[in-house]
Amino acid sequence: MASSSTLANDDWKQGLAAPPKDLRPQTEDVTATQGSRFEDFGLRRELLMGIYTAGFERPSPIQEQAIPMALTGRDILARAKNGTGKTASFIIPTLNRINTSLSHIQALILVPTRELALQTSQVCKTLGAHIPNLQVMITTGGTTLRDDILRLQQPVHILVGTPGRILDLGSKGIAGLNKCGIFVMDEADKLLSEDFMPVIEQTLALCPQERQVMLFSATFPWTVKEFKDQHMVQPYEINLMDELTLKGVTQYYAYVEESQKVHCLNTLFSKLQINQSIIFCNSTNRVELLAKKVTELGYSCFYSHAKMQQAHRNRVFHDFRNGMTRNLVCSDLLTRGIDIQAVNVVINFDFPRTAESYLHRIGRSGRFGHLGLAISLLTLEDRHNLYRIESELGTEIAPIPAVIDPVLYVAPAMVEEERESPPPKPAAIAAPPAQQQPQQRQRQHPPVPSHQVAHHSPAAAPIQQQQQQQQQQQQPQYQLAYGQGPPQPQVPFQQANSSPAPAPLPSYPQQAPTQAQGPAQMQSPPSEPATQPQASAQIPVQGQTPPIQPRAQQQGQQQPSQPGQAEGQSQPNRRPNTGGFRGNGRGQGHRGRGRGRGGQPGHPGAGASQSQQAQA
């Protein structure tokens, strides 16, 4: 009798295509539950169908506590780690309470960034795909107001957006919020900061007094307590932050000079088994410069920051989620709420300034209890921030070891597959006579450094073939379009990571080198030959004076003087200063132009010599 009842309850699963199960191990951040199921919450059948097709098997700890209380209509103040399922904790009860027979806005979800709004609206549509006539709308800054006005003339049940655009539409009467009974704030600590607090209070005033307010975040500053006392009624508080950082994320730091950061990043790319990676910089200018350097190294990457056009930002975010590239260079724009399951490595190219920023950055890896790796590149000036962040977060960031075991950030099944696959046997490739002469000419060029090609062919492919492939990769240079590098083949990341030997280059000229296999041997950066410009490539720090070039290079870069040229600028065809004598005001020696420090041979000065005054 019980079995027939269970079968009847599971009839709704027939005909639904469930996604393949994720066999990767999970940490206690998402597995330490009481054994509840989504069917135990009394959700509507259409919503259960959406949860099943989305691949949600069992609720996480935050979902297990938040969903039942949210279904009762009570205010909720929830604090949980990044990547533990906070988004579904408020979307599932919100969808369950929506009445699609009504045409007005019934739920308002506020998020701090446009990318997070795009992701949240997509989750609403995915989980509510089987709810008939459900209408979800997203509105953010950077889009035309006319399109939003036309869209709001049609029925909208859930409105997702950023605070500024929501207040603009609500204050003008375009978006009717007077019947909105559910008010949700994701990443509430950011929304309740000084930048958003006045906008939030004005928007909340447009909603009715009988409303449900739900706040979700990983960190709660003192401003949250003030908001709770003023606008929430006996909220149900949930705190699952026994520790701030995720248990599945391994954290390392490495001390490097600013001029060697690009070279260190290249070494990490070649040694780590990267599925997808996010690289963070502290300024928009450095984001674009680093993305160009990564592309020049032969790796495909996108970049994104707040100064880009909204259409480009949406396209970058969409393509990166769909696996169009492995690497994304960005600012702190994508530190909050962005959920990309394939990201297993986060690199802080610039060390964050605050503990809050560091916490949200490393939370982009190890999503939903999976394994991840966070590596920070530090200069000597960053060591004080390192100690402060460690003390504030109560965590320990270890120095990067000589060997990084892939078990720490790669799924065990993939690691075992890599170890069990035998290395390919070397094969002698006989080139046709027409190709013999070009190979002879290639031998005259300096050989490719060993640290660049060692990870490509551990099984001993011919050296000439390796050099030829390296030169073919370095010949063309792509012009970045919104951060996009050379295209990559559409293959699963698991297959791409397990490539045992270098394959012939495809039709496009550049391709990201295959990630290394086995444990990563981290070595100190070797001395660079003159033929490798990227090793010494330096991205200027914002606000820092560029390094002074030698005088010989300055003269080679001088431009002919133009009429109206400012006094003191370089003149064309000027002979170098051969000597100067110490003077008390104006240089007296041959070509001497020094004031005070012109006494040693070869020291240029700042004053004009008498001969130059006579010519003037």
UniProtKB/Swiss-Prot annotation:
A motif (DEAD box) lies at residues 186-189. This is ATP-dependent RNA helicase VAD1. A motif (Q motif) lies at residues 36-64. Belongs to the DEAD box helicase family. DDX6/DHH1 subfamily. One of its GO terms (cellular component) is P-body. GO terms for molecular function: ATP binding; ATP hydrolysis activity; RNA binding; RNA helicase activity. It holds the Pfam family DEAD. Residues 1-35, 416-616 are annotated as: Disordered. It is found in: Cytoplasm, P-body. It catalyses: ATP + H2O = ADP + phosphate + H(+). CDD domains: DEADc_DDX6 (cd17940), SF2_C_DEAD (cd18787).
